[in-house]
Amino acid sequence: MICLGEVSFQALADARQIGVDEYWLLGDILMPGTGRRRILDLLDQLPITARVLGNWEDSLWHGVRKELDSTRPSQRYLLRQCQYVLEEISLEEIEVLHNQPLQIHRQFGDLTVGISHHLPDKNWGRELIHIGKQEEFDRLVTHPPCDIAVYGHIHQQLLRYGTGGQLIVNPGSIGQPFFLDAQLRKDLRAQYMILEFDDKGLVDMDFRRVDYDVAAELQLAKDLRLPYFEVYYESLVNGIHHTHHQEFLRELAQKEGCDRELDDWLKSGND
């Protein structure tokens, strides 16, 4: 997930300083966050060799078509974020973001690497959280077979193995890392991962964490009038994510005027 503004640039600066020569995008590119045009312009500058479809791209694609359930606070939150994205991003560009595979494979010598946002055939859900069932993780390395699986979605850096000894890793989230443990949650630096290969195989795995100016990002969110600002604040400052807390979202939408803005947009037809 790389939906933020300031943090994306800091993480990229770190990767460039190290000498990363290709980039993989594991989905959830634009929402929620301030990035929008800045993110797409940034990605255009990178040697991206792999990208897969995240669940937020699905939500964005359906949201701009006003196909989400506007009676649910969590869906209204998504719709308002989609409306915000449309201020800078065209429908054609959203179509490109959505027109990505769920899973791809890369070959490094004898090693096959599977890349997905979540499961090979499903980019949403909780099957691959840190306490997920082993048989669910095995799907990453058996459908089809691969030696290493890289996935996103859970916003947690993770390393574990398939039943057959295959390596399974998650680079975490550049935008909004997630921790259940309160002490770990005090460190909300941007997360990503570097994999280094040579002609013999996998040389190194480096789980990275990068500082960024949280205050600057929050000020940018205010300046750009990011909807549901308090949700964003809680994610960046406290590591608490409210995107599924229905009553919290309902009250915040009324407080910030998001309901009025969204209803006006929903009534405006397909513009």
Regions found by a protein language model. Give the residues of each.
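Active-site neighborhood of divalent metal-dependent phosphoester bond hydrolases
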Residues: 42, 46-104, 128-140
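Short, glycine/charged-enriched secondary-structure capping and boundary segments
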Residues: 10-13, 38-41, 65-68, 129-130, ...
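His/acidic metal-ligating clusters that form di-metal
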Residues: 18, 87-160, 166
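Active-site neighborhood of phospho(di)ester-bond hydrolases with catalytic His/Asp-centered motifs
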Residues: 23-28, 32, 50-55, 116, ...
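A short acidic, helix-capping loop that chelates divalent metal ions and anchors anionic groups
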Residues: 60-62, 123-124, 216
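Acidic, His/Gly-rich catalytic cores of divalent-metal-dependent hydrolytic chemistry
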Residues: 163-271
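Active-site environment of divalent metal-dependent phosphoester hydrolases
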Residues: 2-6, 31-34, 56-61, 150-162, ...
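N-terminal active-site segment of His-dependent metallophosphoesterases
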Residues: 1-46
